[in-house]
Amino acid sequence: MNDIIQRLKSDGFEGFISVENLMQSRKMISSYSGVYIILRLKDSEPEFLEQGTGGFFKKKEPRNPNVSIAELRDNWVTNEAIIYIGKATSLKSRLGSYLRFGEGKFATHWGGRYIWQLKDSRELLVCWKETDENPRVVEEEMIAQFKKEHGGKRPFANLQD
């Protein structure tokens, strides 16, 4: 699965930093618009948590980010390193919000929340790519390509196209 890093680097992605390290410092992340990918490079089956580390979405009417283990299993794409594709008008801001959510804090980042029910979520790698194009369009194209290669399945934590 490590050849995925070389493929992504050749496509302009950079970073490849663990969630754990990015939670400590996000200085190296660009403020530019772009797309980002969360990778799990382990070949082993994932261990899912009943209660993940994700925070609750919105302070006024908090929503529980956790779903059943069965739902997580249903969404898992076997033998695939890419587990989430996201978009950002500011990579630093969006990834910051995503990581704060993963630390159990209130955040405005509901997408990709299944990540935080993985026991090894802090070991996952994050990479990103700046783009002059509309990040949402780039994200949609990337998800469409992923689905084409995986029998119609989205990356594990992508709940919409």
Which residues fall in each region the model found?
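GIY-YIG nuclease catalytic motif and its immediate N-terminal context
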Residues: 1-93, 126-143, 159-161
